Design a protein with these regions (language model features):
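Generic secretory/membrane-interface signal
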Residues: 1-2, 82, 143-146
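Donor/substrate-binding cores of folate-linked one-carbon enzymes
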Residues: 1-80
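A short catalytic or substrate-binding loop motif that flags glycine-/basic-rich loops and adjacent residues
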Residues: 7-9, 83-85, 106-109
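PAPS-dependent sulfotransferase catalytic core
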Residues: 76-91
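An anion-binding loop in the catalytic cleft
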Residues: 88-159
């Protein structure tokens, strides 16, 4: 989520040994991948899990036999992210469309993104895209209702 939220174009996996500190141990392997412009967190997670398991399977035999070792981590280059909460998914449709789309991509799994109408009805955004410098909502779930097309919702709201 952090890479998508930051607008990064690449991310990757690190296979590390554990020590007493969080994300601190020596590194056995690292590999980067490119993030597509439309990829969401759940889609990216599938690719990262596959990549991580492939790298782990490839390095494990040599590590067990002592043919390869771990490299100390450069803690100056380490990156950290914050804990995500449900409140992080709230958006304001008046905000920068680029930033809203980053949130959509990062939080499309959990917590999802949503906004509130003036009457405090929560609208969860299930599908969206970025097109012509605009955040375009395609599918929503209004609080207490079933998923629907955003165009139909807006049309019915105006009737």
């Amino acid at each position: 989520e952090g890479a998508l939220l930051a607008g990064d174009t690449e991310t990757g996996v690190s296979i590390m040994l554990l020590d007493k500190e969080m994300d601190h141990g020596p590194i056995l392997a690292q590999e980067k991948i490119t993030i597509s412009e439309t990829e969401t967190a759940p889609e990216l997670l599938v690719r990262l899990i596959k990549l991580g398991s492939e790298r782990w399977t490839a390095i494990l035999p040599d590590y067990i036999c002592g043919k390869s070792g771990a490299t100390p981590q450069d803690h100056e280059k380490a990156t950290y992210t914050k804990k995500i909460t449900k409140a992080d998914g709230e958006i304001n449709l008046a905000d920068d469309p680029v930033e809203i789309y980053k949130k959509y991509r990062a939080y499309s799994g959990w917590p999802g993104i949503y906004y509130f109408l003036e009457n405090r009805t929560r609208i969860a955004i299930k599908k969206a895209r970025f097109e012509h410098d605009a955040f375009v909502i395609e599918r929503i779930v209004p609080e207490g209702k079933k998923e629907m097309d955003y165009v139909d919702y807006k049309k019915n709201a105006l009737d």
